[in-house]
């Protein structure tokens, strides 16, 4: 199950996905940079993780390579990390050296994992600072890109024991 909800009043984009596995296995998809690369970008723009320090105060830098070969750089500033349960990051664009691009808006992204005996539910909530920021970022295809990226996790789960 995968659902996407855009709420312009709350300034949020929320993706909910369910997986027939443990929270530990889903968490590994965030904690292991090689696994994150397998689903962190849409199929047409695969992700490459450059730096990966998944702890509060840490940073993750990456880039997605588009079909035309152009690289789109990004960075996360880790705000809070509760392994196997949640993480909160400030997500933004970056330059080729991984330095934040302050000319483009950022979002606060909260990831929550809830495990039951049957499944793990992952909820990703992106919080925008303004309706203008929301319109600008969604105008880049962020919603569809995230839906496609998260939609790849089931295939990763089926082909690796670590995720």
Regions found by a protein language model. Name each.
Residues 26, 36, 60, 78, ...:
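Hydrophobic pocket/interface hotspot
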Residues 1-46:
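Hydrophobic ligand-binding cavity/cleft-lining segments
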Residues 17, 49-52, 74-80, 106-114:
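Hydrophobic/aromatic beta-strand elements that line small-molecule binding cavities or substrate pockets
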Residues 14, 34-73, 163:
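Short beta-edge strand/loop motif at the mouth of beta-sheet-based domains
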Residues 90, 96-144:
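Beta-strand/loop substructures that line and gate deep hydrophobic ligand-binding cavities in soluble
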Residues 10-16, 23, 47, 59, ...:
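Intrinsic-disorder/low-complexity, polar/charged segments enriched in Ser/Thr/Lys/Arg/Asp/Glu/Gln
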Residues 23-24, 53-55, 79-86, 112-121:
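A short, structured loop/turn motif at beta-sheet edges
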Residues 155-163:
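Generic C-terminal helix-cap and adjacent flexible tail
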């Amino acid at each position: 199950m995968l659902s996407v909800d855009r709420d312009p009043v709350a300034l949020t984009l929320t993706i909910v996905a369910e997986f027939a596995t443990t929270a530990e296995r889903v968490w590994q998809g965030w904690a292991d940079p090689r696994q994150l690369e397998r689903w962190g970008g849409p199929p047409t723009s695969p992700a490459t993780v450059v730096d990966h320090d998944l702890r509060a105060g840490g940073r993750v830098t990456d880039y997605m390579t588009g079909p035309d070969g152009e690289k789109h750089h990004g960075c996360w500033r880790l705000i809070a990390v509760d392994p196997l349960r949640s993480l909160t990051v400030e997500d933004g664009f970056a330059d080729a050296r991984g330095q934040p691009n302050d000319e483009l808006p950022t979002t606060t992204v909260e990831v929550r994992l809830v495990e039951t005996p049957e499944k793990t539910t992952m909820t990703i909530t992106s919080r925008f600072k303004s309706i203008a920021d929301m319109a600008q970022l969604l105008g880049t295809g962020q919603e569809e890109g995230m839906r496609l990226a998260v939609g790849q996790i089931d295939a990763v789960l089926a082909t690796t024991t670590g995720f």
